[in-house]
Amino acid sequence: MEETHDDRCMSRGDLYAYMRELINDKKWNFNLKNVWAHVHDSEFDTIRGYIRDHLDDAIIIHKDLRYKRLCHHRARIENLLKLNQSLKKEYENSISRYNGAAQESATRRNVPVRDKQRRAVAAAADRIDRKATRHCKSNRERTV
């Protein structure tokens, strides 16, 4: 069986699934210290440390047998583990990430997405056109 690696992206859901599994592992081994702490509580720091300690061995297997190694995503995981509790703080962190140029960066980043969407719409229109004209005998009979 060929192993496929898909380390390019990691979703928040992947991290939360891994956190649940680590917490269940701690419960199974009767290591119950701060297991019930909420992410916003200061007691959750022990869970964060446990996550960081076991990150090198972390693998998430998806249902189509792809797997992701989480050790490649340390920076994103650190960012997700430091949740902001206020909208103002979240906004300030977002602005500082782009050095105060959030508008320009957001515009630049969205351009390829719009191009992808245009290409996808054009490809879908071509497929519909081919389906609609497939039964025609000649080019003159096409009405699309």
Curated annotation (Swiss-Prot):
It comes from the Viruses. InterPro entries: Baculo_LEF-11 (IPR009429). Pfam families: Baculo_LEF-11 (PF06385). Keywords: Transcription, Transcription regulation. Disulfide bonds: none annotated. The keyword Transcription applies. One of its GO terms (biological process) is regulation of DNA-templated transcription. Transmembrane segments: none annotated. Belongs to the baculoviridae LEF-11 family. Involved in late/very late gene activation. This is Late expression factor 11. The gene is LEF-11.
